[in-house]
Each structure stands twice: as C-alpha cells, then as structure tokens.
C-alpha cells in the first residue's frame, strides 16, 4: 500500500501555537536571525534537530517509574549496561549526560597537540572537542560524499585509500580513527559494513583503534539491510552487532537512536583507557554508575535500545523521511541524494546560486523557511564550519539546510505542511538575500552567533505564507 502508516498510536498530545508571518518576522529579528535563539513555542514545526526530541513510548514512561536513584551501584545502571551490551559488546560502558561529554572524555585521553584524528566526516561537537585539545580533525569521506546529487548507496563511507595514505605517512600522530554512522554532516548517509571492515583492517595493520560515533547506528544498520549485498535476510539487530564487532570503542548520544531526551555513553574495550575515562567522569559528570544521569533516564535508554531495532518502526522512519525528500525534488528543490535516514538536506548552494557561500545561503534559506511557515531547520554550511582554527573564514564543503525529523513526533499531515511551505518559498527564491555575522563566539559559533540580512527588505516585505493565525 502507498500510505505511510505510523506504527504507533498517540497517547498524549502537545498543542502547537500558530503564529502569523508578521509575528515571525518580529521574532526572527529579535533572535538576531539565528534560529537557535528562537523560543521553541514560537516554532510551528521544529526540524532543528532529531537529538533529544523523540517522543518516548508508554514502555519508556513506565520505565521511568522503575528508576533507582542510588548514587552508586544503581540497578538501573546494570539494566542500562545489559541493554547496551546486548547490541554493542564492549567491555566497559560508561554513561554520560549526552554524547558530547563522551567525546570530551575520549579526546581528553587520546588527543592533544600534534595529533590527527581522521573520520569519514566529523560533526560539529566532535570536531570542537578534538580541536579543543590542540589536535586536528581530518575528514576523509569518499568523493561521492562531496557531491550532493550523486547517487551512491553508501555516501558516508570513509575513503580507504586516503586513510591508508594518512596512516602510512603520519600514523604516529593518529591515536584513533573514527567513523560517524550515519554521516550527519554529509547528509545522513550510511556507512557500509564492507567499509567498516576495511577501515578496521587498516587500523589493525597500523595498530590504531577504530571508534564509532554511533548516534544513528540503527538507521545505518537498516540501510545496510536494504542496500548491501548479503544482508537482506539478516535482522537489523544482527547487523548492529556485526557493525560494533569491528570497533574498539564508541561514543553515543542516546538522544538519537536510543529514543530518549537526554543521555549518552562511551564504550571501550581497553582497560587502561576505561580507567582514565571513569576518573574523568567522576571529575565532571558523576559516579560511573550514573554518569550525570538519573536512574530513570538509564531505564528509559534501556527500553529505547530494544525499541529502536524494531524493523516496522525503522521502515516507517525511512519511508516518512524519503516521502519529504521526494516531494521536495518534485518541486525542483535540490537535495542531497539519496535521502538520508534522519533528515532531508537541502542543497542551498544550488537553490540560491546568487548568494555566495560566505554570505551563508543555507542560513538565508533557513530564515526564509521560518518566516514563511514557522518551520525551524538548521544550517550545515559556512556558518557552522566556515570559521577556521586560526580565525580565518573559508567556505564549507557544502551549503546545506538540514530538516531533521524528530522520532515519533510528527504525522504525515505535518510533513505535507512543510512541503506546502516550500512550494510557497520556491517561487520567490531569487528575492532571498545573503547574511553577515555581527557577533560570534570563538567556537561552535552557529549556536549563539548574531547575524543580519544584507538586504533587510528581502526578509520583511513578503506576503503571508501558508499559516496566518494569531497566537
């Protein structure tokens, strides 16, 4: 059947506050044209991130009531640990309050000045945590990963030839190799098991550990089942286990593929690294059996890890994301292809060729989409990645607007509304203007930077979009 049916019933709802275009123009101006600065209740459809925005299941809510809040040795920790090891058989599982804390602890152990840490593509917090130690983050995605409309089943793969060349030339400077699954910066693109095995073989040759940044591990496994020869008859759970069998460690934000609102972990096989990690954890996060999380959160993660490998859920998840991508393509909106698992990525460089990269075309599109219909996405381009460690500015590899779809939150009609807003926006894309940054922090500037349009009338004179309602 053609209808995409959500494989769940809705038990609890939250009202959406509708706003007029005039209100949204005022609110985005007050937010200094940075969508991170908006109040969430002034957003109609929030596609800023899929991180921590999932709707939890009835079973997860029930799990909250079982949470044991003992400071040390909580049974909730041991249920959490068992759930992690059921999918990811690492020796040591160290909880953290979210993924970037796991990254910070790991980089504090392995990185430092003169180190290089390669990956297919590092996402923003990983890169920042690497650079905070004085190390260099190196991106080695395959060539197809740089071309938004290139059709490749595993565009998230790391370039094994370039990885081997780096390890051969500078292996003494490489403490770990990372793989981000799926590759968020590159469009939510998956990494094949063949590529994971190939990376592990190189790591073994040069005696370098392989660590997976595994926030969307289940989506990656589902893509493997659908696209990689020999895995069509394997269960997602089996594929997940095989993925992690080739790694020496992992960082994880539970706010993605553990279907919860907070949490993460660092998992390792190396005993010495684990001892150092737990010492750092006690210093900044908490005792090793809670790691900055309440026992109830550990319980919710344990349940979420069972639910995320349900193949009916994953089929719905991929189909709904694909539906949005295909509809935008029909409207003539260029997107990263094939459609990723957690988000649709708009190629703003192609859609708005009149706006130079350092005038931030994806940010321009993000602001216009919010003003048009109250939809919040996020720029993944030169605002996020253009600032270099020495303070200079260079265009990012791609200028993308990410529409990240929260798990189990929106229905098909919400997605149809997003499509309708794009239809209204595409007809006046030529009127959109570039932006400039007026205030920024030294790191991760996209979260708090202030911007302004180079032609304010392009933002504030258009007619109303699809929604015109008073709050």
Swiss-Prot record:
It catalyses: L-tryptophan + H2O = indole + pyruvate + NH4(+). SUPFAM superfamilies: PLP-dependent transferases. Pathway: Amino-acid degradation; L-tryptophan degradation via pyruvate pathway; indole and pyruvate from L-tryptophan: step 1/1. Its EC number is 4.1.99.1. It comes from the Bacteria. Keywords: Lyase, Pyridoxal phosphate, Tryptophan catabolism. Its cofactor is pyridoxal 5'-phosphate. Gene3D superfamilies: Aspartate Aminotransferase, domain 1, Type I PLP-dependent aspartate aminotransferase-like (Major domain). GO terms for molecular function: tryptophanase activity. The modification N6-(pyridoxal phosphate)lysine is found at residue 256. InterPro entries: ArAA_b-elim_lyase/Thr_aldolase, Beta-eliminating_lyase, PyrdxlP-dep_Trfase, PyrdxlP-dep_Trfase_major, PyrdxlP-dep_Trfase_small, TNase. Homotetramer. Belongs to the beta-eliminating lyase family. PANTHER family: BETA-ELIMINATING LYASE-LIKE PROTEIN-RELATED, TRYPTOPHANASE. This is Tryptophanase.
């Amino acid at each position: 059947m053609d209808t995409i049916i959500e494989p769940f019933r809705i038990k609890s709802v939250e009202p959406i506050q509708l706003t007029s275009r005039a209100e949204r123009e005022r609110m985005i101006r007050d937010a200094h044209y940075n969508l991170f600065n908006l109040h969430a209740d002034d957003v109609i459809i929030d596609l800023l991130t899929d991180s921590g925005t999932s709707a939890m299941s009835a079973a997860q809510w029930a799990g909250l009531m079982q949470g044991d809040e003992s400071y040390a040795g909580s049974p909730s920790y041991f249920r959490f640990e068992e759930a992690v090891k059921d999918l990811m058989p690492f020796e040591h599982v160290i909880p953290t309050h979210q993924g970037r804390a796991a990254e910070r602890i790991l980089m504090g152990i392995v990185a430092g000045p003169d180190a290089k840490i390669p990956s297919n593509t590092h996402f923003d917090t990983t890169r920042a945590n690497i650079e905070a130690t004085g190390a260099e983050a190196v991106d080695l995605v395959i060539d197809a990963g740089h071309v938004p409309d290139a059709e490749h089943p595993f565009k998230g793969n790391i370039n094994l030839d370039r990885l081997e060349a780096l390890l051969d030339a500078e292996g003494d400077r490489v403490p770990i190799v990372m793989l981000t699954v799926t590759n968020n910066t590159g469009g939510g693109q998956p990494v094949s098991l063949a590529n994971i095995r190939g990376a592990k073989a190189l790591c073994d040759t040069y005696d370098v550990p392989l660590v997976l940044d595994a926030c969307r591990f289940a989506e990656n496994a589902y893509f493997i089942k659908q696209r990689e020869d020999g895995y069509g008859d394997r269960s997602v759970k089996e594929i997940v286990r095989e993925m992690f069998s080739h790694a020496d460690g992992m960082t994880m934000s539970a706010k993605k593929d553990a279907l919860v609102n907070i949490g993460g972990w660092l998992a390792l096989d190396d005993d010495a690294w684990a001892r150092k990690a737990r010492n750092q954890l006690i210093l900044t996060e908490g005792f090793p059996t809670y790691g900055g999380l309440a026992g109830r959160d550990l319980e919710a993660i344990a349940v979420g890890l069972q639910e995320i490998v349900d193949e009916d859920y994953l089929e719905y998840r991929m189909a709904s994301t694909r539906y949005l991508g295909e509809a935008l393509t029909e409207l003539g909106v260029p997107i990263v292809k094939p459609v990723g698992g957690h988000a649709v990525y708009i190629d703003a460089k192609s859609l708005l060729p009149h706006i130079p990269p350092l005038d931030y075309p994806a940010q321009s599109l993000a602001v216009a989409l919010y003003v048009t219909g109250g939809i919040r996405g996020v720029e993944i381009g030169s605002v996020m990645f253009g600032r270099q460690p020495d303070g200079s500015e260079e265009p990012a590899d791609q200028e993308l607007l990410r529409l990240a779809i929260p798990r189990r939150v929106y229905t098909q009609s919400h997605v149809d509304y997003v499509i309708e807003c794009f239809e209204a926006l595409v007809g006046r894309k030529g009127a959109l203007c570039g932006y400039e940054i007026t205030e920024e922090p030294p790191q991760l500037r996209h979260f708090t930077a202030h911007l302004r349009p180079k032609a304010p009338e392009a933002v504030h004179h258009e007619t109303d979009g699809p929604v015109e309602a008073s709050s």
